[in-house]
Amino acid sequence: MKDWHGQMPERMVDDQLEEQFWAQSITRKKTGQTDPYAAKIFQEIKKSIQQEDSVLEIGPGWGNYTFPLAENVRQLTCVDSSDSILSYLQNCMQEHQHVSYIHAKWESLAENEVAAHDIVIGVNCFYRMYEIKSALYQMNRLAKKRAIIGMTTGPIQPHYEILYKKYGYDIKFPRRDYIEFLNLLYEMDIYADCKIIPLERVYDYESYEQLVTTQSKKILNTTFDRAHVEESLKPFIEEKNGRYYYRHDFHAALVSWEPK
């Protein structure tokens, strides 16, 4: 997907850069560490899955859903384009003999490379895929009982709305959203269900400088006034014992359907 300047993001077109990103990301993770907000999403996913099911997970990343899936299904297959990710997951789940791994891009998966599974699921894994409809066809083809797409969505952190509306900055608002998937599925004659899940994330910063620097990254302008950022952040920040906390309410969407 093209960025706000009409260019393909480097990580989308450069497999080596993407691999470096994941290799570096997992070094900063404690073994088995997941994002706290993912637990609430998984509780909704779990409602569609039975203990005897086989599940195929697309782009598991550092295991937000992989780890709980492994504890709740008969068979789990993880498909990811990153060697680093698959090695990390294998290391974390050595005792899980019912989990297998396929190193491949989902959209390039050969027709006979993996068997159909009861459930096919992918959460926040579509950002590098050019042909989204082809990816959806692949999900529909390989799911025997249900296909599930998960995606975290807006609203964006509220101080960016102030920077946009009050100060006129160009902001990197979320672009690919669950509505796009619903529309593409509709074009495929699939009437999908959609569940919106309210979520909360608390960003924790060691210093004020780290807070301001991190929460300026979605400003697209080449220059900006730091005072504007600080003023926009002020209503949303709590300082406690020298650390800074920013609570952000957002949502996840679960789009799912019975395969046709």
Regions inferred by a protein language model and the residue ranges of each:
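A short SAM/SAH-binding and catalytic strip from SAM-dependent methyltransferases
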Residues: 119-131
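Conserved Class I S-adenosyl-L-methionine
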Residues: 191-260
